[in-house]
Amino acid sequence: MIINRRILKSFEEISHSLEESLREVAFDSQQQLIQDVREENEELSRLQDQLQLIRSIVEKICISIKTDNIDSYCSVPFDLLYNICKDIADPSSFEDGDLQYLVSQAIFEYIILLCYYSVTNECVQGLPAVYEAEQYYKTVSDSILKSFLYCLQNSVSTIRLLSQTVLKDVNKKKLSHQKWSLKALSVDLLEKIRPRINKFMVIRNFRFVGLPKKPIEIASLVSDIPRGIVHERLDMVTQSSKYYTIKLGQLITEFDQQPEENGMFTEVHLPNYERRLKSLQDFFGLAMSDSNLLDVIRCSAKFHKDHPLRRFTKPSILTRYWPSILLCLLYGPSSVMSLWNSRYFIQDFIKTNVVDFAKGLILNWLWAPLKQVWSTVKHDEGSAISVTSQETLNSDMDSLTRMIVSFVVDNSDSTSNSPIDPILLSTKVEHGDLTEFMEIYETQLHHPIKNIATGGLVRSLLIQLQKTKVDGSMALNGIDKMLKSQQLVFGVVALSPALVILYSSIVALKRFVKLGNVWSNEKRYREQISISLNNVERVLNYSKQGADADEEHLNQGLLVIEVSNLYKLGSFLIPRSRKKEWFRDVEELVDTNLDSGAHINVVNRIYHVYGRFLIH
């Protein structure tokens, strides 16, 4: 909780101030203290024991505050505090600077701070629920259907309260030996609810202009009754939220207000005793002259036990959902039997649409593409896409080489007097150099008919046909290589849908484990943080506009509530490594030592430092 850090600091200040005061008194008048201790050994021993009890309680609370749990709250044993305070005289009854004065005042300071800890935690934890209830009732009041549903949901509790009221009246009449009857009870009950009915009818009459028709008026009356009930509850919740927010702001402002430096305080005094006690007395409406610390402890214990803010929250889950639960109880058994009779159909449906889908997704869309990609990466020729065989191309090329070499050797006498080297000629043909063959072919074309008749030109044409076949095979081989180079891309494309589905499932599972919802609450958290930051900035902008005391206390209370929401919601979104920075910066928003301009700068710092975690 945002206030707890400041309370922890106050505990440390009290302990440090007590130690310094005791050390200074012991140093200044050691001999006199020894004599006083001998004379009042029993009283000092009792005070020391009570101080140790108080400090043990304080240590437990400090340990609870220092934990990482934001909503941690350590219950305060008010009965023990009451007994301790009852046995201790007021510090003003001792001499100023006396050892008993220092110890008793330290005990009182601790007790006051423990009461403040309990009250502020109740308010800071309870007021957000009250404001949430206010928003809930506003939403319900805007709809006739929701208003009817609200009245239906609360009908059971209304009947129960009515029965308790009637029973209480009957018992009262029995105790007073008065006669009673159903008619008399009905009259008494009508007299009790008559003011509410009159108020509702007066407000309702302002809505009509002219004289509506009778059916319309009756229908309007039926629809206005539920909405009137909701509006009455809304007004009560709104007034209560404003009242307790003002009280909280006043308590925080007065409790943390620095004392005036008028030269009346000495170093042995523990600070803020009377002022802090008065702030708690004002919170509970106690007169300072007629009340003391015992009354504050009693009121704090009652405030913690009764939880007055919980009376203004929205209806409980059982109240809101008992109609649905009743329908489930009425129609649930038959629905369960119907499901049981259809269990085989449901089983087949799940197997076909869930199990087979998951199995096919893993095997066909994840495992098979992964194998294909792996085979492509390690150059597995057996799994490659093939348009033509490499062995076929090699055999065709070898055949063409032999045909050309044989043809050139057979016709070399007629074209050249130099001997032909078959090995050199084979090398030239393999590299695409067909000069010798083309020269013979050109010579044969000079006498085509003669060469056709002798068969030489026919042989040349067949070689040309073989060359065309080899060229086509080489083109297909190039296409085959291009397809092989794209095979990895095809595999990744085939794998991508399954990877997207798998990644989404893992992210949903992670969010379910972390945030408790398959569909992440991050969007809702970011929206609430944006609203809180906006409200914080508005409160800070209007805090110094010459408002009255109640308005200033209301702004202070709203600021604490909104900052508390920021403190809590931001912990869900801020990375663990930066949570300490986040807590430090948010706590500066309620630091009373900073003015409104410095607070605005803190808001701007939050925007540009943590904006990528909270807003975007």
Swiss-Prot record:
Keywords of the record: Membrane, Mitochondrion, Phosphoprotein, Transmembrane, Transmembrane helix
InterPro entries xrefs: NCA2
One GO CC term on file: mitochondrial outer membrane
Positions of post-translational Phosphoserine modification: 29
UniProt GO BP: aerobic respiration; mRNA metabolic process
Pfam families in UniProt: NCA2
Localization in the cell: Mitochondrion membrane
Transmembrane parts of this sequence: 321-341, 488-508
Membrane-related topology note: Multi-pass membrane protein
Top-rank lineage group of the source organism: Eukaryota
Record-stated family: Belongs to the NCA2 family.
Function: Involved in the mitochondrial expression of subunits 6 and 8 of the F0-F1 ATP synthase.
PANTHER family from the UniProt entry: NUCLEAR CONTROL OF ATPASE PROTEIN 2
Miscellaneous comment as given in the Swiss-Prot or TrEMBL entry: Present with 2940 molecules/cell in log phase SD medium.
Protein name: Nuclear control of ATPase protein 2
Organism: Saccharomyces cerevisiae (strain ATCC 204508 / S288c)
Gene behind this protein: NCA2
